[in-house]
């Protein structure tokens, strides 16, 4: 290589380094901007945590102190009367928790399996009836049968009355979850991998279980979290389908307890032995929120990274 060529090569190398430095400088933000964004995130976190803190503190405050002093950052008068009233009959709450946990776990697994299989079929370009089943699924996002037909279908046709199945089976499938999983299959699983597996003699089930599922684990976690939150917070199915207290879930049990408490407060004048001041009303609502949201908050950190990625992929490419 001549001296002229060496100089030209060094000049081009320096130009590339300078261009790289300028590119990095454009992508980096200043300390002042970084500090500003950190302050915004801290304020946002406070806005999220503050209501939860108020709920917890209010639930362990006496009804009289809460009525007199209002909401405080620390209980003015410590009391667990709201939780005592909520768990006054332990067997009812234990049954409600048991039914809710069983329904949530079983329904989540069922949702992941059904949505995963259905979405995988829709993601395959060689599936003959892909358009029909895509329309069949997404049609339910636009039109619903109504409450009367829903009531008759679940109670009479499917025979779900007074069963644990009523708490999760009607919620085990969603067209929105199908969109998320289909997007994951199409974006996270290259077609070349599936073709290579077929060339090596792998069948559809082996390809799905050993190759596709590990690559789409974020999608399964997202669908599972959506399903678990929906089943845990649902009380409409229990209200419409179940009549026996043995099959009530946590949300409907607390809903009934709140109605009973409201009835006592409104009709206290007719009941000489009832002291309205000792009945928790606002504190009971706060205790209900703590009892119902607590397990979900504790479980969410384990699924957070999957959940965030699932929403991102589903939103961008769905």
Each PLM stretch: what is its role?
Residues 2-318:
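A hydrophobic, multi-pass inner-membrane permease signature
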